[in-house]
Swiss-Prot record:
A Pfam family this chain is assigned to: Ribosomal_L23
Keyword Ligase: no
Transmembrane segments: none
Function according to Swiss-Prot or TrEMBL: Binds to 23S rRNA. One of the proteins that surrounds the polypeptide exit tunnel on the outside of the ribosome.
The protein's name: Large ribosomal subunit protein uL23
Tagged with keyword Repeat: no
Assembly and interaction partners: Part of the 50S ribosomal subunit. Contacts protein L29.
A single cellular component GO annotation: cytosolic large ribosomal subunit
Keywords of the record: Ribonucleoprotein, Ribosomal protein, RNA-binding, rRNA-binding
Entry's family note: Belongs to the universal ribosomal protein uL23 family.
One Gene Ontology biological process: translation
Gene for this chain: rpl23
Length: 86
């Protein structure tokens, strides 16, 4: 899968903004067929960051969300600012 096909859009809520600031995590809507490895690869390709871990869930609406924790030394708030979340 292409990186642009994997990651669809950032999730922007009060909870996700808190996660960016306190836990160094970003939350995205992703393609339902994307695996955790696909999501890691897409994050590295699109944002040039190293990913520590990826947690995924499928919402009752059928959308897949990915909670992406970045490794030490990478700042989620900088990526969030470039995406227009702040």
């Amino acid at each position: 899968m292409d990186a642009f096909d994997v990651i669809k859009a950032p999730v922007v809520t009060e909870k996700t903004v808190r996660m960016i600031e306190e836990e160094n995590k970003l939350v995205f809507y992703v393609d339902r067929r994307a695996t955790k490895q696909d999501i890691k690869r897409a994050m590295k390709e699109l944002f040039d960051v190293e990913v520590e871990k990826v947690n995924t869930l499928i919402t009752p609406k059928g959308e897949k969300k990915a909670y992406v924790k970045l490794k030490e030394g990478y700042d989620a708030s900088k990526i969030a600012a470039s995406l227009g979340i702040y």
